């Protein structure tokens, strides 16, 4: 896969390679201006390249645009917010 082309559909951001999803992050509305990041998947051959962080940042960008707060249900998303203090303002309290 030469170029990361992050695509979107309702509830997810994803990367496809030859028509197959090789990386995806899913989120769902929780009501009252809150979304949860539910799951992150990166195919084994793409792990360790920062793709999961890119996908979390896509959800963060979406949350900022839509004025939403985030609940990081997915353990990877929780880890991301642990590392990136500046984005914690988006966490639902």
Spans of model-derived segments:
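Conserved acetyl-CoA-binding loop-helix of GNAT-fold acetyltransferases
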Residues: 48-61
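C-terminal structural segments of small proteins and small subunits
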Residues: 58, 62-93
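A short, internal acetyl-CoA/4′-phosphopantetheine-binding micro-motif in the GNAT/acyltransferase core
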Residues: 40-47
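Conserved N-terminal entry element of GNAT/NAT acetyltransferase domains
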Residues: 1-8
């Amino acid at each position: 896969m030469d170029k990361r082309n992050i695509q979107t559909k309702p509830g997810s951001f994803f990367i496809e390679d030859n028509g197959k999803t090789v990386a995806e992050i899913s989120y769902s509305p929780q009501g009252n201006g809150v979304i949860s990041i539910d799951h992150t998947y990166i195919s084994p051959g793409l792990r360790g390249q920062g793709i999961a962080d890119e996908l979390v940042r896509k959800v963060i960008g979406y949350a900022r645009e839509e004025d939403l707060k985030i609940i990081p249900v997915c353990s990877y998303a929780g880890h991301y917010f642990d590392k990136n203090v500046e984005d914690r303002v988006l966490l639902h309290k």
